[in-house]
Amino acid sequence: MPVINFTYDELFKQLGCTLDKKELIDILPMISSDVESYDETEVKAEFFPNRPDYYSIEGIVRALKGYLDIEVGMPEYKVVEGDTTLTVDEELKDIRPYVASCIIKGVEIDDDELKNIMEFQEHLHWVIGRDRKKVAIGIHDYDTVEGPFYYKAGTPDEDKFIALDCNEEESLNQILETHDKGEKYAKLISDYDKYPLIVDSNDNIMSMPPIINSDLTKLTTNTKNLFIDVTGTDLTAVTNALNIIAANLSENADSIECVKVVYPYHDDVTYPQFEPKVLDVHVDTASEYIGMDLTADKIIQTLEKTRFNAQKVDDNTVRVTVPRYRIDILHEV
């Protein structure tokens, strides 16, 4: 299971209050965590693969706020319509056909958060992305590029860029041969005549998914706005990953700006897709499965503490609104 590392100081800062350290260690299992280890400064906690919304400290804090009655009910995010587009190349249909994107405005990134973002990205690569085969994620400094954006098929020996943490411009094939990420993930695209690229309106290459980002868009502690791209072979997985990233990384940001993905072979899609799922929970069914005598009011109170919205329909029915980052919730049971 993924192990999430965080410091007490980092967590308490985002939580907005300080807990006794032992109290925190006792609470974490109540939000589905297995505490692997801890010391005076840091905690290492495991979370199940069906809860990728916990794979960054923002997701953990969001759950703790509910458990501690600091904030209950479904979180609300400021999502603003924008005119940014990401246009998909027809040639990618049989290579890596799907992409999702959004822009997160007004982030504050210190060294701890920079580390958190990188670890969050890699955890999602493993759990949702199946080690990047199904989904790959790019997180960029938005202020280094200019829209509109393009998801295009690049020519391996002609297109060139400076890969992340490198100094020299190389062709796409050279990056596959010389960069450690290129060597590790080349098998995912090397059989194709062209490779996927994310580029901006000035033809700056931002990334070669699922391999490596460009050094041009590297995140730093001066980064204020994020451009997110998620590419993959499965549209549902791509959408789920983008929604989770958008929700978590905007917890401490000003807003999320929508990006419209324009396809030549699929309906256009605007992201993020935060329209919640709505389902009914029945008191008698819940009581039978849990083995307790429950009431609609008690179920509502519990659901709100776990960051759902819930309202009473009748004495046996509670209507539940499920946020889109909770991809583990499939049905009533």
Placement of each model-derived feature along the sequence:
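RNA/tRNA-interacting regions in translation and RNA-turnover enzymes
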Residues: M1-V333
